[in-house]
Amino acid sequence: MSMFCFQCQETAKGTGCILSGVCGKTPEVANMQDLLLFVVRGIAVYNQALRKDGRSSARADKFIFDALFTTITNANFDKHSIIEKIKKGLELKKDLSNQVTIEHAPDECTWYGDETEFEEKAQTVGVLRTSDEDIRSLKELVHYGIKGMAAYVEHAYNLGYENPEIFAFMQYALAELTREDITVDELITLTLATGNHGVQAMAQLDTANTSHYGNPEISEVNIGVRNNPGILVSGHDLKDIEELLQQTEGTGIDIYTHSEMLPAHYYPQLKKYKHLAGNYGNAWWKQKEEFESFNGPILFTTNCIVPPRPNATYKDRIYTTGATGLEGATYIPERKDGKQKDFSVIIEHARRCQPPVAIESGKIVGGFAHAQVIALADKVVEAVKSGAIRKFFVMAGCDGRMKSRSYYTEFAEKLPADTVILTAGCAKYRYNKLPLGDINGIPRVLDAGQCNDSYSLAIIAMKLQEVFGLKDINDLPIVYNIAWYEQKAVIVLLALLALGVKKIHLGPTLPAFLSPNVKQVLIDNFGIGGISTADEDIAKFLA
């Protein structure tokens, strides 16, 4: 059985995974994800038509962003759960089709098949359905941006925030991707619009997070362990960890964060829980080793899952929820009737486990989202004016397995002492434990939070632009050297472009889904570039 996927940075040979996914995705899972996306596009066409006369379906809105999130890299490896989503999607599409007529409807709207036909149909609806290389490249750029946006939309939705304008745009974009006559120019316009709506989605999530949990503040986070049983929470969904903290309070079970959940420690309304014990381990890709020694159950609230080895001792300790899935793992169902998720099964499991084994000790510091940095604005501005801070380096983004990512550690180590790193996302793990010191009390690594908190870095940049009276954001002493891995990084990139940021450097490699011509458009219009060596790049960026 064959597949084709090139949505992540680690795609095989830098061109595409065809036998199995580097991520661990089987061809069966990859093809079912393609079919799910095909069904989603059809639902979007119908719901967009219904929206024009005020009859759009809220059920369709939610199904679309949840299904998109399911197909993000490392989110869902459970073929059966994806098949169930396809079946539900087909039922939903049928329901919508009974309410509106679409003239010249695309195949995405008209196809209905049972499970015996899924595999055959999936072979025809994936990335390679588009023969023109540039059209395909731009379609997938938009597709991946919309996937990343869907993740941020779902997190905000879980906290009670939704924006009909964002739903409408996502579905308009998905409907446009069904067009066989769409042009390069139309797709470029759609790409830029995706970036603009990405800014809105990140702003909405920032509002949702801060209104519920307070503004992130400077916080020390323990990276050691205590002597109690623990539950390790990975992913990005703050609502999930909040409910788990509430349900474990007073039980003697500690809660630890992993990878992108680290910033939970920065929010006042989460850090107040005394049993939020610390952060265990490093970036997502090290989990095969680190989960062995944690001893307790692990909860994946979102990506990034790495399928465990067959002989892994922690296989029966994995729990998934939300859009995530892994065959053999226990799934925590969604909230019903306004009630919390029921985490009792994972809590009972934790009671039977030994405490985690320490793999590190000490503390790390974070919490430098926009409100906290703006509160320090006078100090930062003075440091820039005095020359104590020569330049800021935005090193937000994702971490990954490739050995070439050691570049980011070397880059951080070799940066001069009068520079400051602004970061968000799991890229931080390449340097957030290095002894890089501070500048007049300002840490040289300012961690804003999760990947979506790249929005904070943009807000900080715009505030500095205002303070220094600059007309162009690109005149600031800021260099963008961003590591990417999956589709949320794509929407962050498109959002930065929408805000006018130019000369962004992406690494460790440029996306395989960018055709030579599309890549050239990004270079010519936005100054997008790659990376070389740490020494060469530092010399170039400081010149």
From Swiss-Prot:
A cellular-component GO term for this protein: cytoplasm
Gene: hcp
Entry's family note: Belongs to the HCP family.
Catalytic activity, as annotated: A + NH4(+) + H2O = hydroxylamine + AH2 + H(+)
Cell compartment(s), UniProt: Cytoplasm
GO biological process, one term: response to hydrogen peroxide
Annotated organism of origin: Bacteroides fragilis (strain YCH46)
Summary of the function given for this chain in its UniProt record: Catalyzes the reduction of hydroxylamine to form NH(3) and H(2)O.
Positions where Cysteine persulfide occurs in the chain: C398
EC number of the protein: 1.7.99.1
Protein name in UniProt: Hydroxylamine reductase
Cofactor annotation remark: Binds 1 [4Fe-4S] cluster.
Cofactors required: [4Fe-4S] cluster; hybrid [4Fe-2O-2S] cluster
Domain of life: Bacteria
Positions contributing to [4Fe-4S] cluster binding: C5, C8, C17, C23
Disulfide bonds: none
NCBIfam families in UniProt: hybrid_clust (TIGR01703), PRK05290.1 (NF003658)
Keyword annotations from UniProtKB, A to Z: 4Fe-4S, Cytoplasm, Iron, Iron-sulfur, Metal-binding, Oxidoreductase
SUPFAM superfamilies: Prismane protein-like
